[in-house]
Design a protein with these regions (language model features):
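N-terminal, charge-rich interaction modules
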Residues: 1-25
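Polar/charged alpha-helical tracts
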Residues: 8, 29, 33, 92, ...
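Surface-exposed, low-hydrophobicity interaction/linker segments
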Residues: 16-62
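Amphipathic protein-protein interaction modules
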Residues: 45-103
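Short proline/glycine- and acidic-rich turn/helix-capping motifs at secondary-structure junctions
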Residues: 49, 103-118
Length: 118
């Protein structure tokens, strides 16, 4: 899926989720319809993933640095073999959630009040 990419340069692993591509953007709009606080800019994707990963995949948050922007969600890891695995797992999680968007909507419907939105 071309809306999420991993790049490696120097001692850094960078994962970028392009939230302005059609499919993620449309899903973000639906998430916002479900919960007014969930206007899905990069900062609220950070809030969502902080919550979702913390609850379901806390190991992925170890060593992660978030760098969201209005139109994208980016994370960095220091380059290690372990962090490369984490980045690949995070990419797979993002793809799974976007390709199976009902999972996202379920979290928003049932747990939005637990998320620290921007």
């Amino acid at each position: 899926m071309d809306y999420v990419k991993i790049m490696k340069y120097g001692n850094i692993i960078n994962l970028t989720f392009n939230i302005e591509q059609d499919k993620p953007f449309d899903i973000g709009e639906k998430m916002n319809e479900i919960c007014a606080d969930a206007y899905m800019n990069g900062y609220n994707w950070e809030a969502f993933f902080n919550y979702y990963l913390g609850k379901n995949y806390p190991e992925i948050l170890e060593g992660i640095d978030f760098d969201p922007k209005a139109g994208m969600f980016t994370v960095y890891y220091d380059y290690t073999p372990e962090n490369e695995i984490k980045a690949e797992k995070l990419k797979a999680i993002i793809i799974d959630l976007i390709e199976n968007e009902e999972k996202l909507y379920k979290v928003i419907k049932e747990e939005a009040a637990n998320i620290e939105w921007d």
